[in-house]
Amino acid sequence: MKQPSVKLRGGVAAMRLVAMRSVAMLSVAAVLLTAAHLGAQQVHNAKYPKDPAFAPLQKSDMGETINFTMENSKIYVGTSREITVYVPKEYTGKEPACLLVCLDGVLFNAITVMQNLISSGEMPVTIGLFVQPGVIYARSGEAGSSSKAGSGSKAGSGSKVGSGAGESCSGTQKRVQRYNRSNEFDRVDGTFARFLEEEVLPLVATLKCSGGQPLLISSNPNNRAITGASSGAICAFSAAWFRPDLFRRVYSSVGTFVAMRGGNQYPWIIRKTEPKPLRIYLQDGVNDAWNPLFGEWWEANQLMESALDFAGYELFFKWDRGGHSIKHGTALFPDAMRWLWRGWPAAVECGCSRNDMLQALLPEQQAAQRSQPWQRCSLTAEERALFEEACKSPMEAISPGGWSKAVAQKGSMWIYSYTANNPGSPDTEWENGLEFYYLHSAPNQIAFDTEGNLYVASEIGIQVCDHNGRVRAILNGPKGSVERMLFIGNRLIVESGGELFCRELRAAGSRNPFKEQLPKSQGQG
């Protein structure tokens, strides 16, 4: 009577064992299939529509290419770099041409695309300036690295950009002491833009075409675009961001907006900053992560897209399933150029941000006024006296109503806040000092408005902090950095680049805090 149950248990056990083996085999198969599927997906889309702008140029269609080595930089001391200039066949030398700067050399098959788009009338007559990053070679000339300097310019359709170093244009191998690419490209400041403005473009202006025509390049920022891939892309964005007086149109391919040298900070800086007159085309791949140590490129580009959209920029964002290469960026390059130059010569204009602090501060203006909100101004003798008086104590300010006092220090990202033990009295003593206001750039001068918001003149413009010590808005300085400032009513006067400028705001400055009404609380949120 027991035997059948024993057999039954044995049969069930065997069946369970077979089932477990089957499940295990299916699981392994599923893992292999999933891995194969993911491997297949982590590549660029298989096909792209062939754009006519990639059609090979006939000899009769081509313009002129000028190559040279640039040395003796004062900004990037000791560096050497290769530069290519392309002059389209339509250029006559009689009037200034537009400009396209491409970082890491000739990427995206750019010369062919440029010439075809210019010939078809889809792009204005544009001189191409292709700039490699700098390297410093050993004086001894000993053989060392065998790859070419700035080999990002040689990147194929599926190659990574900006890897490599070490051969002169003559082909003689040299030992590289320093690669300057990351230092030049990944920095979040206007240094590379200044390098282009003060050193590269003046040098290009000395060149002539084979027919003797001078190279005339428009100084109008609306006639200038800049592009790059990877670190070159963030460099292109930074050049336009910090110097919209130089560049207004940006193409970014697989941009390195990650934590290399502060690029990860851009999304929240963009959200807080008064919009600039820029038009931006972003490209990236879902699987873009050159080195996860620094962050996720795809995630960073999505944050950039979100921030730029919030801040009201003219923006186009395109992606595929690829990784960190320029295959997709190359395929999109013709459309990116068409989109960036569409409507030319109409000016690129400022959009309207959804930042509520900016909306509260800025008056409604036409697009042209938003692009140039500051006007040069001269002061009356009385205004000059007020300006100089305000600048005698640039690092202290008392809030309206006399309830708190802000004290800043040169070079510090923190501003101390003190509370009054006898609020509203000029004879009060100040107590409870704490690091309270946190800045994005060190202060040059501080002042309150009548609503109790703290204004901070700084290198990145005027930071505006709320009652709780947070920067909520950043007003662009007329020349970038703002050294000094003064409110006269709702007229804000600043010194920027050694010149005086003014603009009107909806806010008014606090002039006599102990006689002014205590502002409405902003709560603790």
At which residue positions do the language-model features occur?
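Non-catalytic cap/lid and distal C-terminal segments of serine-dependent acyl enzymes
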Residues: Q41-G156, K160-M357
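Short loop/turn segments immediately following beta-strands, especially the blade-tip
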Residues: S417-P426, L505-R511
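Structural signal for beta-propeller blades
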Residues: M413-I415, I462-Q463, L500-F501
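Bacterial N-terminal signal peptides
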Residues: S22-A35
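Blade/loop signatures of beta-propeller domains
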Residues: N355-L379, P423-P426
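A short beta-strand motif characteristic of beta-propeller blades
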Residues: N432-Y438, V471-L475
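Beta-rich, blade/repeat-based domains predominating
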Residues: R370-A406, Y438-N453, A457, K479-N490, ...
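Blade-level signature of beta-propeller repeat domains, shared across WD40, Kelch, NHL, RCC1
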Residues: L486-G525
